[in-house]
């Protein structure tokens, strides 16, 4: 694209070379330049926590006790970062959307949700938001007239968005992806969506323009734990947790090296002769053969003295495992997890049922808070889809809606049957409805 500066971009699936194209305006080129620069800056921040969630991080070797030659050949990892994300993804599940005054899920919105297979896609958005601060939802026209709008979950690694001064509405957005190995770009503005692909000559050409003139960019940000100074959200993999994980991995590396060097007890031999270390042919035995076999019996010397064999204290792995357990306990406090979640099992004093329930309650409360934050983004997504169905206009009945979430806790059938039966008997719940069945 003429004038498009992409020299600093490093993306895993697509590069954007500065090649001529007569189909883009100067404004579009300037917009793409700004979005690409923003993507380059944000990508490093997003990956800094994502690599820990995937257990692909590189641990810095302090080079004090372990040389680089050993550290480069060994890799030690713990899966604690995933525990900061996965338990909440398991607790977040959308069952549908309700309009004011309705007790059952709205069927029009359910058709939109099911038609885009979002029951399966929603967990992708929750995982990205919890691990990388945010996820994106995009809305577009259907493949042909009369089709449902397309609703997609997009990784923040493949999106760049600029926002208004309040930080709640997108001004423009850029998305990149590959189809059959061919790079594609989607540029979203207030008036249109421009789809570009790289041709066989390496030049970018416009594949399609969807001129909707809706006055909004069909992109919604689902931010995790946003702040007034960080509307883009914060990862559940916090700097404190990352520090503990790095320290634990270094201790595991030390344990691995020490087990190789000191698992066989070291010995000291006094008074042995050279012949004790030779085979029947007079050749010197290897150190391993000598250590394993020859020290089982040593002959007296010519003066009748027996060589002395001393053994140093055997290596104790508890030197490292106790430290690792201490790090696991610290991580459990940050994660609101019971020790068993981090692999700590104490047979003599196991976690009590009350302690377990307290941790589960804390996680459930946190999941409910995330339902409120993520639910606001999901409502905006469904409202955008309704705009696409109604020529950019949002019907009055869809201006207010609520998300129906599956309860984060999973009580047994016996625990729920009694209170629901009493509510039905009191007339607080209808005997047959989606709400009653859900409970």
PLM segments and residue spans:
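C-terminal structural cap/anchor segments
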Residues: 330, 334-399
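Generic structural marker for isolated residues within well-ordered, non-membrane alpha-helices
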Residues: 109, 328, 382, 433-437
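Short coil/turn segments at secondary-structure boundaries
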Residues: 124-126, 140-142, 259-268, 341-347, ...
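Extended, helix-rich architectural segments
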Residues: 1-153, 158
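Extended amphipathic alpha-helical segments with heptad-repeat/coiled-coil character used for oligomerization
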Residues: 389-420
